Amino acid sequence: MAMLEVKNIEKHFGSTDVLKNISFDLEEGQTLAIIGSSGSGKTTLLRCLNFLEIPNGGTIAVNDEILFDASQIKSKKDKDLRDKRLHFGMVFQSFNLFPQYTALENVTLAEKMLAKDLPDFKQNKKEIYNKIEEHGKELLARMGLADRVNH
């Protein structure tokens, strides 16, 4: 059983085919390198794998659970798709923080942006943000950075 199964992923921007029938399996513990020239679709593939871009075709499964099936997606705001985005992340080659933000603000930025899509966000913004900030503090504490929350 593959930990990650990517089957026939396609992505088009207008009439330009960026990804065509990309398929691979990744076993637990394996490392995968995605290599290609500038503009070859590497970043687009990664964005599709963590649901920042919606593929036009194909499936993505993790531990035999289909997380994405292009034939099942209604829109970018599909609730299930939004929920799946919360479980994926991307580590960039050049790691940067926003220097104007505190450690807590940097850690919680993505989750706060995603929270704006929640159906009850406007009514419960303060409560939702408080939960996100508590989660961010827990993450910083796990990394030994509890004393750096406001730095």
Language-model segments: which ranges?
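Conserved structural motif at the start of ABC-family nucleotide-binding domains
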Residues: 4, 19-21, 85
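Short coil-to-beta microelement around the adenine-binding A-loop and adjacent beta1/P-loop entry
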Residues: 16-17, 82
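Helix-to-loop junction immediately C-terminal to a conserved catalytic motif
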Residues: 50
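Conserved coupling/switch loops of ABC nucleotide-binding domains, chiefly the family-specific signature
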Residues: 56-59, 63
